Amino acid sequence: MGWALKKVCFLGVIFLISACTVKKNGVKNLSYKHESLRAYENAKDYDPTTKKATYKRNFFERHFKHHTDSQGNNTKQPLDNGMRDSNAIQRATMHPYQVGGKWYYPTKVDLGEKFDGIASWYGPNFHAKKTSNGEIYNMYAHTAAHKTLPMNTVVKVINVDNNSSTIVRINDRGPFVSNRIIDLSNAAARDIDMVQKGTASVRLIVLGFGGVISKQYEQSFNANYSKILHKEFKVGESEKSVSGGKFSLQMGAFRNQIGAQTLADKLQAENKNYSVKVAFKDDLYKVLVQGFQSEEEARDFMKKYNQNAVLTRE
């Protein structure tokens, strides 16, 4: 009888631990709701004043769970790169999504487009877990997380401090930390010498889509990158752009072309993720902004620039 009571108590403790893990202050932990948005947990555990993680490992993690050393050194053999590429996955991962009360809108990009920002990297705690497009994250492969780039976009990452570079394929969403533009795998972070520092100022250049590097970058790729990268990436016919936009805005209509072009130039300079053009129709020069993923995204743009803009479907 005593053994049965102990067993019941033990199961009760396990249940309570599980409940506490899943919920905190009555709110379901995001990692259980959507495991792939793992960078959100990083954001909550990051202290911007000390620039250090506030998260402390529990007893089990400290003494039993395998971790790499502070330099991220780990000689374990890599998993299969495992790219998932289908129209269904592409459509699903271009939908707007919300993290921490903020909406993110995957949007169109063009071949050769450039972006500047701060890169970080993620590794052991997420190795072998699912990414946003359903792949298994492999910290030894050249992949990365980005908040809005289409899945399987191939990007060159340049560390502007030392001019080293690498190539990655986007297969995850994040990092959901202020001022971060991309979250690199351990392998990619090593290529540009940022593992120890943790972050680096980078420039991103879009090289291709669908996991394929465009032929126009073939010579540079063959001359400058290692055999490892040549095993992971191939050069071929790649689309010139990928667009998920379904909505557009007419921001103004002018009889004078100069006035229309002035507004278009201003909007384009301030909004690199959208396509802004001037179209002549019905004897008017109309300023159009294209590339919105949802009506909500377009209306947010209207609130910022012009409440009277005309919303249309592309």
From Swiss-Prot:
What UniProt keywords apply to this chain's record, in alphabetical order?
Cell membrane, Cell wall biogenesis/degradation, Lipoprotein, Lyase, Membrane, Palmitate, Signal
Pfam families, sorted: DPBB_1, SPOR
Where are lipid groups covalently attached, annotated N-palmitoyl cysteine?
Answer: C20
The protein's Enzyme Commission number: 4.2.2.-
Residue ranges constituting the SPOR domain according to the UniProt record? 241-314
* Signal sequence extent: 1-19
Where does the record place the S-diacylglycerol cysteine lipid attachment? C20
| Record carries keyword Hydrolase | no
Matching entries from PANTHER family are given as: ENDOLYTIC PEPTIDOGLYCAN TRANSGLYCOSYLASE RLPA (PTHR34183:SF1)
**What is the stated purpose of this protein?**
Lytic transglycosylase with a strong preference for naked glycan strands that lack stem peptides.
Q: Which family does it belong to?
A: Belongs to the RlpA family.
Protein's UniProt name: Endolytic peptidoglycan transglycosylase RlpA
> Which organism does this record belong to?
Helicobacter pylori (strain J99 / ATCC 700824)
